[in-house]
Design a protein with these regions (language model features):
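Cytochrome P450 catalytic-core helices
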Residues: 22
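Basic nucleic-acid-binding interfaces
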Residues: 1-19, 28-60
Length: 60
């Protein structure tokens, strides 16, 4: 799954996004925060990174 697809998934779960530093977005959900890299549309995110972001946001 690339970062755009993962961002759409997170948005459906009620996550809001703010610009971060460089090519990153700050993801916020229920007072919890994580960082999502936006390093190009076709680049795949690792499963460990997606799992950590979901855990940080209380989705897992």
């Amino acid at each position: 799954m690339n970062s755009d697809q993962f961002r759409r998934y997170l948005a459906k779960q009620g996550t809001t996004f703010e610009p971060g530093k460089g090519g990153h977005l700050l993801c916020r959900r229920d007072g919890k925060t994580s960082v999502l890299p936006q390093h190009g549309g076709a680049k795949q995110l690792g499963t460990g990174l997606m799992r950590k972001i979901k855990k940080d946001l209380g989705l897992e």
